[in-house]
């Protein structure tokens, strides 16, 4: 039951952080409204989950703390369903190039940020 509460608390924190990003005055890219907030959210969440994995690999933290941070915070913060909906919206409006750019950037930057987070922890904590 404590594991469930850890995920619940982390998920709430992640969701609130995600909501707070909606207050950032994002600029529109070009003539098409580009979903920059979701892209930033998912890349940042990927970086954070990479940090968590790096810390677990180098220092180890309790399984409950991993559930709180990885499943809870990152799960509540990142927004794959919003990514899918916004991608479909761009396609529906005929904005094929921005849709392709958004999907490719989300994937490439998300994976890259996850790797960067793990590498950063390795460097900071002395693991090569």
Annotate the PLM regions.
Residues 1-128:
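Membrane-interface helix-loop junctions in multi-pass transporters/channels
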């Amino acid at each position: 039951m404590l594991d469930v509460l850890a995920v619940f608390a982390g998920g709430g924190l992640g969701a609130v952080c995600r909501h707070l990003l909606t207050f950032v005055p994002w600029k529109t890219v070009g003539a098409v409204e580009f979903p920059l907030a979701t892209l930033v959210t998912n890349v940042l969440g990927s970086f954070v989950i990479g940090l968590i994995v790096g810390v677990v690999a180098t220092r180890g933290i309790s399984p409950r703390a991993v559930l709180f941070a990885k499943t809870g915070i990152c799960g509540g913060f990142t927004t794959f369903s919003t990514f899918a909906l916004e991608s479909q919206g761009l396609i529906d409006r005929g904005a094929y190039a921005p849709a392709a750019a958004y999907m490719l950037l989300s994937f490439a930057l998300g994976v890259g940020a996850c790797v960067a987070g793990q590498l950063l922890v390795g460097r900071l904590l002395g693991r090569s």
